[in-house]
Amino acid sequence: VELGSTRIKGVVIDESFAPVESGDFEWESTYDHGIWTYDLADAREGLCQVLSQLKDREGLAAAGISGMMHGYLAFDKDWNLLVPFRTWQNTITADAAEQLTQLFQFNVPQRWSIAHLYQAILNGEAHVSQIAHITTLSSYVHYMLTGENVVGVGEASGMFPIDSATGNWNEEMLKKFETLTQDQPWNIRDVLPRVLLAGQDAGRLTASGSAWVKGLLPEGLPFAPPE
């Protein structure tokens, strides 16, 4: 299932990767108080609408969630959304992106999650002290389905720089970012999701995850890392 910018799309493929059936749901971002955003309730409803269009859901062998990269979804320790979803469409992090690019000596675009996080810090936004998790749209949906707070390495590369040798967050850049957040009650290492490579175990659909999609998928369904 792909949560794209204009449509949520679901495609079932067979063992030879040929498409068998599909479903879709149209949605669009809204401009609210200077922020391009989507309502996460719409993401859930759209996902359910897509799944309801697929006939052989019980016969699925595995599933995966994809979505628009980048952006900023910040949650507290109980996974309550702290501020509306800030999508990749926003260009509101110029100061943070420039400063991080200089600090890391590595290009950090405005749309990256870490640029959004640091801009919120620079802005003195009240929610920053409550942050326990930041993630992307596909990883949020994956967490709601499986209870696993993970991100695929491709998706991760739009959150924070990746070390291609380890397939994980860049250690030297994590250390540099820590120097900027010493006054925060959290550490960036704890706030970011766990990075997985393609093919690694990313969890299975839980009972609560199945309920989250109105029972449209069977409990125990294995999931690929979200990308």
Give a label for each model feature:
Residues 13, 25-26, 87:
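Residue-level structural signal for beta-strand termini and adjacent loop
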